[in-house]
Amino acid sequence: MRSWVVGARLLLLLQLVLVLGAVRLPPCTDPRHCTDPPRYTPDWPSLDSRPLPAWFDEAKFGVFVHWGVFSVPAWGSEWFWWHWQGEKLPQYESFMKENYPPDFSYADFGPRFTARFFNPDSWADLFKAAGAKYVVLTTKHHEGYTNWPSPVSWNWNSKDVGPHRDLVGELGTAIRKRNIRYGLYHSLLEWFHPLYLRDKKNGFKTQYFVNAKTMPELYDLVNRYKPDLIWSDGEWECPDTYWNSTDFLAWLYNDSPVKDEVVVNDRWGQNCSCHHGGYYNCKDKFQPETLPDHKWEMCTSIDQRSWGYRRDMEMADITNESTIISELVQTVSLGGNYLLNVGPTKDGLIVPIFQERLLAVGKWLSINGEAIYASKPWRVQSEKNSVWYTSKGLAVYAILLHWPEYGILSLISPIATSTTKVTMLGIQKDLKWSLNPSGKGLLVFLPQLPPAALPTEFAWTIKLTGVK
C-alpha cells in the first residue's frame, strides 16, 4: 500500500513538472529582478536601457581605417564619386578630364584597387604599437563597394574585383591575435544603388534597398566576423524606421553571436544621432565643452581634410603630434573615447607620416597610459583648459598641456591631506609640493630637467594620491 502511494505521488510530481515546463513565462524586462539576461524589444526605450559593455569605456583609444575604391583616385576626399557625379563639382570634373579617358566610369577604378602590399600583420603591429585598444575598418562606404565577399554586392566587392581577397577577414584575424578589439564600419546608404534611388523616389515609403542590401549585409557581417563594435554611418537621409534599425539591434542584443560584448554607435537613422544607440558620436570630430551624461566618442582624422587617403594632401593638412595628444587627453577627461583615422593607399600601405603620428601616440601612452586606459572622469575636468583631470581608484591624474612658468604648477581643485603624495609618470622620485598660498589646492614643484630628460615632449602627467 505504501509503495503504491509513493508511486502515485511521484507520478503527480512528474505531471506537475511537465505542466510547468510547458508554461511560457513572459520575458523579464527589469534587470533588477531577472535571473536570465533581459530580452530587448525593438524600440528605443528598451534598446537604450542596455548597459554598455565595460570594455569600450576602458579602451579609450582606437584607430579608424577608411579604405575602399575611393583610395584609387585618392584625390579630394573619400566622397570623390559623389562630388564628381552627384554634385558635379567643376574641380572633380576637370580632374577626371585631365587624368582619365572620356568614357572612364567610377566602376573602372575597382580593378585598380589592388591592395597589393596589404600586410594585415604589419598593420596590426602598427596599431598595437600605437596603443590602440580597438580598430574600426570600413567594410563598405557610401560608394557601396564591400571589403569582404558580400553575397548581395555582386561584382562590387574585394573578392570579385580588385584585390580578390577578404580584407575584412584578414585584418580581423591579425588584429585579434594581438588582443585588440575589432570594429566594423558600415554605411547604411549607397549613393547610386538603383534600389536606394528607387526608395528615395518613393519618399522612402518602400524598403527595396533595405531588404535586399542593407540588412542582409549587416546580418552577414555579424555572423561571419563577430565584431566587437558596429560603427554605423550613412543614416542621415532616412528615419530609423526605414532602415529597420531597431529590429536589427534587438536581434544583435538578444540572439546574435556577439550579444554580450558588442557595442554600437548612434547613427541608425536621421533622428538618432546623439539620442539613441550604445554610445554617441553626435557628429564627426564632436568635442563637448562639458562632461556629457552619456558615453561618447570623438572620431577624427590625421588628414584634416579627408578620411580616405588622398595624393593631394599637404603638410599643413596633417594634424601635428601635440594636437593629437591634446585631443586625446581632453576627450578622455570628458569621459569619451578617441578614434583616430588613417587612410591607406590603394596598394594597402599606410604612408610614413600617418605611421609617425600613430607611433607618437603609442610612445606617449607607454608613459602616460596609466592616466588614460580604464580611467574615469574626476569631479573636476579641467583648469583653464591647460590642465585636464582623470581618475582611477584612489589616484587623481592632472595632465598639463603646457609647462608652467618657473616650473611651478598651481592646481586649484585638489584638496591636500596628511597623506598626499605627488609624482610625475615616467619619473621615479616624488615631487615636492606645498599648499597653495591662495588657500585653494596646492603648488607642485616640477622636476628641474632639460627637455630631453623629461618623460615626454608634451603633455606631462602628475599623479596625486591622498587628495580629495
Curated annotation (Swiss-Prot):
The record marks 299 as: May be important for catalysis. Keywords: Glycoprotein, Glycosidase, Hydrolase, Lipid metabolism, Lysosome, Phosphoprotein, Signal. One of its GO terms (molecular function) is alpha-L-fucosidase activity. Glycans are attached at residues 244, 271, 320. It comes from the Eukaryota. It is found in: Lysosome. Coiled coil: none annotated. GO terms for cellular component: lysosome; membrane. Belongs to the glycosyl hydrolase 29 family. PANTHER family: ALPHA-L-FUCOSIDASE, TISSUE ALPHA-L-FUCOSIDASE. Alpha-L-fucosidase is responsible for hydrolyzing the alpha-1,6-linked fucose joined to the reducing-end N-acetylglucosamine of the carbohydrate moieties of glycoproteins. This is Tissue alpha-L-fucosidase. It comes from Bos taurus.
